[in-house]
Design a protein with these regions (language model features):
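Domain-core detector
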Residues: 1-170, 179-245
Length: 245
């Protein structure tokens, strides 16, 4: 079994790089993401379903967004870093309208979310022997105060705190979570209660939670108001949605 692939940060370069060994759960997470347009993605109703959605701001076409997602899937499977992915999308003329800093943000957010989902799956599989999670912030000059306030929080894997505060907790968030055994949690000190700090606006969800049912319900509600023929065609899309585990 492949365990944990590393997601590393070079703080002085503000870069994300992933190791070449594929982390299977992260790959599967990326493949399950669904294409939505930017105005849908940033709708307030999407807060709890954003983990299963993928979009790219400033790119309006579904086919264009799909090309970006496909390229990111390949990058995660191969362990490509940002520079390699950027060169590939340039060669394939994908996302050419986006400046470099936007491309890096797209890459970083997608990779972080995929690995967060993969780690969540791993933590759930092993919570009998490692029943606690510890929040870790980088704690340098670029760490947001709200993120730093969560540093060192140690709570059970299934504590409600992790449903809204599992990293990434904002754009370019460098925070991580690590699993602990009972002995390790005892040494670190289990938190009596969750801190009052909150993630950045729009990031209050756990990327690893399966929200397929909620997303399907939301889209069905939208489809219900469409004309007959369009409604029938749109309904067929639901057959492609993954079911809950």
């Amino acid at each position: 079994e492949l365990l944990m692939n590393s997601l590393q940060f070079e703080s002085h370069k503000k870069r994300v790089k992933i190791t070449p060994l594929p982390f299977i759960d992260a790959i599967e997470a990326m493949k399950k993401r669904k294409i939505v347009l930017p105005d849908e993605y940033y709708d307030e109703k999407m807060d709890s379903t954003r983990a299963l959605a993928f979009t790219v701001s400033r790119i309006a076409g579904v086919s264009q967004i799909k090309n970006v997602l496909d390229s990111l899937n390949r990058a995660i499977e191969k362990g490509d870093g940002f520079d390699t992915w950027q060169q590939n999308v340039k060669d394939d003329k994908i996302a050419t309208t986006l400046p470099k800093h936007r491309q890096e943000l797209v890459y970083r957010n997608a990779v972080q979310n995929a690995y967060s989902i993969g780690r969540h799956t791993h933590y759930q599989k092993h919570k009998e022997t490692r029943p606690y999670l510890r929040y870790s912030a980088v704690n340098d000059s670029r760490t947001r105060p709200s993120h730093g306030a969560m540093h060192g929080t140690v709570l059970p894997v299934d504590d409600p705190f992790w449903a809204t505060n599992t990293p990434p907790n904002g754009h370019a968030c460098r925070c991580t979570v690590m699993s602990l055994s009972k002995r390790q949690a005892g040494r670190a000190g289990v938190s009596g209660k969750a801190p009052g700090a909150k993630p950045d606006a729009g990031w209050g969800y756990n990327p690893g939670t399966d929200y397929a049912g909620e997303m399907k319900a939301m889209l069905k509600e939208k489809v219900a108001g469409l004309p007959g023929r369009v409604k029938k065609s749109a309904g067929k899309l639901f057959e492609k949605y993954p079911s809950k585990n």
